[in-house]
């Protein structure tokens, strides 16, 4: 059958949804995007990290050259501790050399604007389109909008975020609820004007007890920042905290004098803000990604903290894999795919994506607790091992990046470097586990009053790499 006879309905004009629209357009597959907001790129104060695995797909879609005009590649990361000790790492620069794409940040609003403005047929992107019901049959699926408009398609994709309507309808149709999402941290995030002393192309990570402040210094000194705090207890979705503008004030006032880099305080960051907001940080990878002719992608399927910077990149990879599987299936069809064929395809999609996403999610869970010095393990690991780890942070990031997915029906980017093959099947997992085992041993010894063994950890690990 012609690919344009198969119709995909994308719920959500998010980064996930708009990237999928670009992927489907390149594959020649008919689709429409339904976005409930009245504008395509609202400013909510958020920034987005584009890592090489996401950049590579965006390059395939001929979008990355435009994105490059608004980013400043990171070259250095500085990490600081409550006792005043600081060290710097060039791992971001090393990652760029290995993969041909940098680690970089830009306004979430700007990325959405690029995705929207460079989409060739804007009649396919419907704004102010609020879904009120979803029905699925053995032949097709139907979505009814608040204004009474009805859309019919062969597949519904939920790219509608952490509070996904499609996910809720999917659970209802499957007659099961599959929650598991929890919240233990909150995040105040924002964008500020340049601040003297914060150097373009650098990232600052300030680790305190149950508090992390991260700043990324982008194009022309624009500062993207996160303030992450541990909450009073663990919350289980949907009973999660919501924060209003009034609630941010007292928290900010309490932290204004905190110095996160040399003599620069959080108050300076706050006072120079252009925009800021506060949210709970949900964490989960859902087990159920599809049912019938409905499937999830992006934050509707998996939600992680911003510490690892992979949230948007995972959504971009989702779009690449789902569109590749659809393109391959439709090339072989003379008739619209049956329910069984759709279910097989969606099972393949989950089989490809779930293990990779889950692995990165676990790293994200570790990082948010490690950076917030949550417990003696993370406190000692951060203070006494991390400053002497050498290239291990770059190696771990490389392992994560190298497994990235591509649009199988589009040419691979020519700018890719040696790291994609070198680190795809590297044995870094063994090194990480060795670090953890040694650190646990060190903790035992430290309890007996012998801290010297902790200082020997980097030497012992380097012997195993």
Curated annotation (Swiss-Prot):
GO cellular component, as recorded: membrane
EC class: oxidoreductase
Cofactor: FAD
Pfam families recorded: FAD_binding_3
InterPro entries (UniProt xref): FAD-bd, FAD/NAD-bd_sf, FAD_mOase_fung
Domain of life: Eukaryota
Main function: FAD-dependent monooxygenase; part of the gene cluster that mediates the biosynthesis of the indole diterpenes penitrems. The geranylgeranyl diphosphate (GGPP) synthase penG catalyzes the first step in penitrem biosynthesis via conversion of farnesyl pyrophosphate and isopentyl pyrophosphate into geranylgeranyl pyrophosphate (GGPP). Condensation of indole-3-glycerol phosphate with GGPP by the prenyl transferase penC then forms 3-geranylgeranylindole (3-GGI).
Protein name: FAD-dependent monooxygenase penM
Source organism (scientific name): Penicillium crustosum
Biological classification of the source: Eukaryota, Fungi, Dikarya, Ascomycota, Pezizomycotina
């Amino acid at each position: 059958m012609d690919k344009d006879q198969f119709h995909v309905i994308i719920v959500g004009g998010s980064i996930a949804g708009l990237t999928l629209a670009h992927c489907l357009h390149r594959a020649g597959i008919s689709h429409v995007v339904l976005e409930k907001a009245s504008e395509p790129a609202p400013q909510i104060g958020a920034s987005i990290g584009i890592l090489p695995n996401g950049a590579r797909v965006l390059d395939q879609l001929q979008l990355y050259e435009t994105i490059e005009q608004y980013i400043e590649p990171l070259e250095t990361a500085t990490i600081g501790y409550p006792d005043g000790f600081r060290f710097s790492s060039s791992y971001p620069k090393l990652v760029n050399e290995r993969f041909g794409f940098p680690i970089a940040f830009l306004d979430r609003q700007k990325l959405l604007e690029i995705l929207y403005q460079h989409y060739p047929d804007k009649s396919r992107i419907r704004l102010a389109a609020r879904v009120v019901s979803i029905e699925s049959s053995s032949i097709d699926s139907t979505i009814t909008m608040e204004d009474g408009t009805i859309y019919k398609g062969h597949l519904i994709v939920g790219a509608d975020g952490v509070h996904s309507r499609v996910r809720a309808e999917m659970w209802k149709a499957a007659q099961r609820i599959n929650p598991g999402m929890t919240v233990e941290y909150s995040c105040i995030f924002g964008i500020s004007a340049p601040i003297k002393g914060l150097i373009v192309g650098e990232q600052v990570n300030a680790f305190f007890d149950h508090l992390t402040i991260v700043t990324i210094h982008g194009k022309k000194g624009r500062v993207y920042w996160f303030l992450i705090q541990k909450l009073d207890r663990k919350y289980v979705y949907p009973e999660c905290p919501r924060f209003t503008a009034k609630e941010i004030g007292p928290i900010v006032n309490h932290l204004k004098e905190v110095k996160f880099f040399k003599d620069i305080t959080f108050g300076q960051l706050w006072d120079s803000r252009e925009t800021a907001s506060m949210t709970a940080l949900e964490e989960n990878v859902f087990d159920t990604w599809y049912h019938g002719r409905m499937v999830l992608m992006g934050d509707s399927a998996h939600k992680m903290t911003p510490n690892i910077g992979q949230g948007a990149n995972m959504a971009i990879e989702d779009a690449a894999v789902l569109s590749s599987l659809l393109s391959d299936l439709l090339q072989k069809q003379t008739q619209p795919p049956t329910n069984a064929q759709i279910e097989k395809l969606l099972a393949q999609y989950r089989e490809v994506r779930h293990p990779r996403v889950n692995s990165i999610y676990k790293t994200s869970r570790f990082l948010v607790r490690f950076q917030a010095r949550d417990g003696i393990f993370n406190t000692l690991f951060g203070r006494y091992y991390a400053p002497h780890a050498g290239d291990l942070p770059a190696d771990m990031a490389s392992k994560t990046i190298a497994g990235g997915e591509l649009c199988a029906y589009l040419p691979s980017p020519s700018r890719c470097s040696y790291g994609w093959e070198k680190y795809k099947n590297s044995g870094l997992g063994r090194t990480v586990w060795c670090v953890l085992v040694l650190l646990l041993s060190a903790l035992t010894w430290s309890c007996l009053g012998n801290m010297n063994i902790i200082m020997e950890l980097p030497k012992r690990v380097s012997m195993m790499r």
